[in-house]
Amino acid sequence: PFDYDKEVYTDMLWIAEGITSYYDDKTIHRMGMFSDEEYLGIIASQINRLENSPGKDIMSLAHSSMLAWVKAYLPTEESMNTTVSYYNKGMIAATMLDLEIRAKGKKCLDDVMTALYTDFYKKQGRGFTHEEFIGVCTEMAGKDMKPFFDNVIFSTKPLDYERIFSQYGLSLKDENAGKTVAWSGVVSSHGNGKTTISNIYSNSPAVDAGLSVHDEIIAINGWRVDGRLEDHDAKYGVNDSVEITYARDGKIYTAKLTYAKSTK
């Protein structure tokens, strides 16, 4: 049903890839190769990754799927701040969808996938639309699932983890709550004796200091940097200011960076 001589746009890659990612770990857990604690740790890690992605507030999951050709496979230094992964958020959405369907104790996401295969592929020889997918989820959940999709798939609203997970006696704990951790907003890499900025979080101290992606960080307060810049964050407190020496396009510059409280 697809013309592979040209791009095929869809807003459902989160289903093809995100749900697959969900079942990757779910299947191993079912086999007993992950303990309950290990499996919940994997979910928590994925949630942590998403919540630390500024792009989640800019791009919806459906939009991320649709723009895969021009965004996911053509990343820029702004991708971290403007896009969201349909693998990462898709996996979380699938987790929440399964839990929502299971709430009445009758059906689960397995039943949705089986029905899609039987009713659309086997009986009609075709795929399905988003509307049809929502319809099958509604049937299996025994309630209207459109609000779930409107909030989780088609918008950039914060995900309501508490409501979903509390139904199963689970809750999320912010391990940084109450802590004051200094943060520069830089994501850097270190190799061949050089520390280079890979990404910068939007609205961060690094942006205010005028630093840019690809800058080579040479020194902090006159001391040579050995390793990633963010590895030095723990040495400083919130509101501490440091002098950053860096190279850009062959020229040496200095900048004043004032650490902020980490939200990561």
Task: Name each model feature, range by range.
Residues 40, 74-76, 80-166:
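Amphipathic alpha-helical substructures
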Residues 212, 230-264:
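PDZ-domain C-terminal substructure recognizer with occasional recognition of PDZ-binding tails
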Residues 206-228:
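Conserved PDZ fold ligand-binding element
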Residues 20, 105-107, 149, 186, ...:
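Terminal peptide-recognition signature
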Residues 1-55:
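Zinc-dependent metallopeptidase catalytic helix centered on the HExxH motif
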Residues 171-208, 213:
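PDZ/PDZ-like groove recognition
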Residues 2-6, 66-80:
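Acidic/His metal-coordination segments adjacent to aromatic residues that form catalytic metal sites
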Residues 37, 62-63:
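Solvent-exposed soluble domains appended to multi-pass membrane proteins
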